[in-house]
C-alpha cells in the first residue's frame, strides 16, 4: 500500500511516498448461466454474477491526519479495510441549533476541533469500507420469434458513502440549497426532532470565530453517512429481427432494429441519500450520476 511517510529531513521534501502498509485480502467470485425455457418460438436465458471481496491492513507505517480519514475516499488504520471511512462523532444540536461533537480530547464541543490531529483518533467512529464487499449482476434475455428483450441489473453492497459536504456557517445568494434544509433547526426545541443545523446568522459567527469548524465537522460527521448499497436497472433493450422472407425482395441478408436504454433508475438505495447516486461519488461526497442514455440501432446486412 502506497502512502506518505516522514523523510529523514536531508532532502527538500519533509514527506515522501513509500510502501507504508501490509495487508491481507480474500474473496470469491462465481458465474451461473441457465437456460430456463427453450421451445421452438420462445427462449429464456439468465446470467448471474456474484463477487465477494474483503481486505484488512495488518501493519501501517503512516500517521494520517483526521481530515484524511474522514474524507469521502476514506483512509485506514491497522485492523481495518484499506479504504475505511471514519467520522466525527455527532452528538446532536444544542439549544441554538448548532451541531455538537466529541473532539479529540473527549469533550463535547461545537467548534473546538483539530482536523490536523495525527495522534489522538480514538474519538473517531468507524463507519465501514468505502469499497463494496459484494458486487455482481443479473441478466435475463427473452426471445419470442423475432422479438428479443434483455433486462440487465447490477448490484453492490457492503460499503458506505459520505454525503455531499453542503453545510457552511455562511451562505451567499448564489448557494444551491440541499433538500435537507427543509428540515433544519429554526426554533428552540427543534433540536429534539431534527439533526439539521441552523443557518447561522451574523451574530453567531461573531460570537464564535471558529464556527466554520463546526459546520465542516458536521459535513464529515456520523450524521452525513449513508449506506452505499444499491440495485440498479442498468440496461433494458428491445429488438426485432425481420424475417428473411420480408427482406429477400430487398436483397438483404439480415435486418434488425434495437432500442436500448442505459442507466435508467435505481431499484433500491438508502433513503438517506435523498436522490443522490451512491455509485458515483468523489472526494467530497456523492457526485453527479451518469446520465440516462437511449440508443436506436438499425443493422443492415448486405
Where do the model's predicted regions map?
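Conserved small-residue
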Residues: 18-24, 28, 35-130, 161, ...
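Composition- and surface-driven signal marking solvent-exposed, interaction-prone regions
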Residues: 1-6, 43-47, 61-64, 149-156, ...
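C-terminal beta-signal and terminal closure region of outer-membrane beta-barrel proteins
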Residues: 15-25, 70-94, 177, 189, ...
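Flexible, surface-exposed loop regions and adjacent strand-edge segments
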Residues: 3-13, 61-71, 166-175, 270-281
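Extracytoplasmic gating/loop element in the C-terminal half of outer-membrane beta-barrel translocons
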Residues: 158-251, 255, 274
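Membrane-embedded beta-strands that build the outer-membrane beta-barrel scaffold
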Residues: 26-36, 44-52, 136-142, 147-155, ...
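Flexible, solvent-exposed coil segments and beta strand-coil junctions
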Residues: 3-15, 112-122, 207-222, 273-280
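Transmembrane beta-barrel outer-membrane domains
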Residues: 11, 21-25, 129-133, 226-233, ...
Amino acid at each position: 500500500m502506497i502512502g506518505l511517510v516522514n523523510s529523514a529531513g536531508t532532502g527538500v521534501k519533509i514527506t515522501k511516498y513509500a510502501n507504508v502498509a501490509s495487508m491481507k485480502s480474500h474473496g470469491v467470485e462465481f458465474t451461473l448461466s441457465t437456460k430456463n425455457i427453450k421451445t421452438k418460438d420462445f427462449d429464456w436465458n439468465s446470467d448471474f454474477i456474484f463477487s465477494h471481496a474483503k481486505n484488512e491492513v495488518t501493519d501501517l507505517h503512516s500517521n494520517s491526519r483526521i481530515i484524511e480519514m474522514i474524507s469521502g475516499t476514506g483512509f485506514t488504520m491497522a485492523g481495518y479495510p484499506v479504504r475505511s471511512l471514519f467520522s466525527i462523532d455527532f452528538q446532536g444540536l444544542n439549544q441554538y441549533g448548532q451541531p455538537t461533537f466529541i473532539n479529540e480530547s473527549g469533550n463535547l464541543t461545537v467548534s473546538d476541533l483539530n482536523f490536523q490531529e495525527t495522534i489522538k483518533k480514538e474519538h473517531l467512529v468507524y463507519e465501514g469500507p468505502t469499497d463494496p464487499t459484494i458486487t455482481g449482476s443479473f441478466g435475463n434475455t427473452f426471445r419470442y420469434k423475432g422479438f428479443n428483450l434483455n433486462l440487465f441489473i447490477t448490484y453492490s453492497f457492503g460499503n458506505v458513502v459520505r454525503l455531499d459536504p453542503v453545510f457552511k456557517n455562511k451562505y451567499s445568494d448564489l448557494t444551491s440549497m440541499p433538500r435537507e434544509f427543509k428540515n433544519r433547526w429554526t426554533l428552540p426545541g427543534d433540536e429534539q426532532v431534527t439533526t439539521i443545523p441552523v443557518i447561522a446568522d451574523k451574530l453567531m459567527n461573531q460570537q464564535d470565530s471558529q464556527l466554520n469548524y463546526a459546520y465542516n465537522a458536521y459535513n464529515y460527521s456520523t450524521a452525513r453517512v449513508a449506506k452505499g448499497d444499491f440495485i440498479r436497472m442498468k440496461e433494458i433493450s428491445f429488438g426485432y429481427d425481420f424475417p428473411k422472407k420480408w427482406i429477400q425482395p430487398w436483397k438483404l441478408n439480415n435486418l434488425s432494429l434495437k432500442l436500448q436504454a442505459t442507466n435508467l433508475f435505481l431499484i433500491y438505495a438508502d433513503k438517506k441519500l435523498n436522490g443522490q447516486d451512491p455509485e458515483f461519488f468523489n472526494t467530497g461526497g456523492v457526485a453527479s450520476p451518469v446520465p440516462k442514455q437511449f440508443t436506436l440501432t438499425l443493422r443492415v446486412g448486405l
